[in-house]
Amino acid sequence: MVTLKTAVTIDTDKGDIVIDFAGSSGPSPYGINVVMNYTHAYSTFAIRSCLDPELPNNFGSLAPIIVTAPEGCIVNCKYPSPVNARHVVGMYVAMPILKALYQVMPDRVLAEGSGAVWTIQIQGRDLAGAAFTSSMFNYSGGMGARRTKDGPSATCYPTGVAAVPIEVLEAAMPILFSRKELRPGSGGAGAARGGDGQVIAWRMRTDSEWLLNAVTSRTHLAPEGLGGGEPGAPGRFLINGEPVSSARKLVMQPSDEVTLETPGGGGYGKPVAFREAAE
């Protein structure tokens, strides 16, 4: 369990916005530690996207936003802490900041989203015996709802990274997808609904064992709603229909089927608001 404790204050004398990560977890032995420039980037993005998304991204707009974190903590790690999967924690940096801003500008923030993108990497041999190693590919869950707008489905905040089309992946390696679709109802209910996650399923076209490295997110703690909105559905990582919680590299059999069900975003506002408006 990783704790991100965040305080957002405004210095009325200097006009600065100060974001402090004091109290955050210490460094992890796994590669999920985050360097300070990554933390700074996602922190300032969260502030700027609420204040004015059209602000130019330059020194003048960034200077009043001050980000601090204890040296050596998980969001300000130091060498030799491993950082290869830093997105697993780093993509959550914006969430506690948005919760703090909700107290003063509830119409500008969004509910919790699906968190970090799910990343996949595969190694093995094709039917001809030739070795292959895939590049890392990823899938997003749903974004949290805004006060007056539903959250976009299969879209990650704060990255907005796009996925490689399955046709490209099938042409590049011996993989065969059987499903790539939205996950209806996974977004949290509310006056505005959270975005839905997605379902992806595949098998490998091989007669040899193969290796799967899947880095998932939010399979236990669902994205929270805001203002009475309901949480989105947590994600599920399945092998042959059975849930898997391990993030280690897995040895897979030729006939194994992998299914990813990414989380839905949290809803915003009480769901009853829909019925009251209809009446």
Locate each region found by the language model:
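Glycine/proline-enriched, intrinsically flexible loops and inter-domain linkers
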Residues: 1-279
